[in-house]
């Protein structure tokens, strides 16, 4: 059996734990844009400098190795080939699966008001990269609106 989970948020990680508890032998691959696992609920703690990037993680450092999980990090899914049971990544790589779980969660919504979406200083807060961009921008900002 080949399992593929898209997303390494709380739902994806919990699914991986559950699969590994029931099936210790099968192939398990996780795919995400993220380069490290982090709690989205704790991103505000990063912005307030109460936690660093490592302290946002909710899994042990060796989680993927210990659970024999292949993690394709910093990867975006381009297309699902359902009939062929393959996930195509942006770089053209295809990952085969028998069972697929899409656990990507939501995305921030920036309303289509004027040029708001194109502004370099307007952010959503869903990913660590969002928090990092906000933190960097805040260093130079004179006024901040939340």
Question: Which stretches of residues belong to each language-model region?
Answer:
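FAD-binding core/adjacent interface of flavoenzyme oxidoreductases
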Residues: 4, 61, 65-145
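Beta1-alpha1 glycine-rich phosphate/pyrophosphate-binding loop at the start
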Residues: 1-70
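Short linear functional motifs in flexible/disordered or boundary regions
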Residues: 27, 40, 112-113, 146
């Amino acid at each position: 059996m080949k399992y593929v989970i898209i997303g390494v948020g709380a739902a994806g990680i919990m699914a991986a734990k559950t699969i590994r508890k029931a099936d210790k032998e099968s192939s398990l691959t996780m795919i995400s844009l993220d380069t490290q696992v982090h709690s989205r609920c704790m991103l505000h703690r990063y912005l307030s400098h109460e936690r660093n990037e490592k302290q946002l993680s909710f899994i042990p450092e060796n989680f993927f190795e210990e659970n024999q999980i292949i993690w394709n990090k910093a990867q975006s899914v381009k297309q699902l080939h359902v009939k062929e049971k393959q996930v195509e990544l942006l770089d053209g790589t295809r990952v085969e699966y028998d069972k697929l779980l899409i656990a990507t969660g939501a995305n921030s919504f920036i309303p289509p008001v004027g040029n708001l979406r194109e502004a370099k200083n307007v952010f959503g807060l869903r990913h660590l990269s969002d928090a990092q961009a906000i933190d960097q921008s805040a260093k130079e900002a004179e006024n901040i609106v939340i």
